[in-house]
């Protein structure tokens, strides 16, 4: 269930930034397929990947992890 939560949050923040899967995958230097698997909860992102996703989406890693609410 944790994997699905990660994926949903990543997808939601990606969409808020108006990035396609293709664009984010390219910036992440990973395939669209792997990013899709992460967003679907079928693959667990590594800490390095989470840090890079948070950086690219310009959000604190704690917000991506769901540890703080937006705007705090």
Q: PLM ranges: what are they?
A:
Residues 18-37:
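Short alpha-helical DNA-recognition segment
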Residues 15, 26, 55:
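Alpha-helical residues within the helix-turn-helix
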Residues 15, 29, 40-42, 69:
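Residue-level detection of the helix-turn-helix DNA-binding "recognition helix"
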Residues 9, 20, 46-49, 60:
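Residues that mark the N-terminal boundary/hinge immediately upstream of a DNA-recognition element
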Residues 48, 55, 61-72:
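Short, charged recognition helix plus adjacent turn
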Residues 1-16:
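A short, Lys/Arg-rich alpha-helix, primarily the initiator
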Residues 34, 44, 63:
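Residues in the helix-turn-helix
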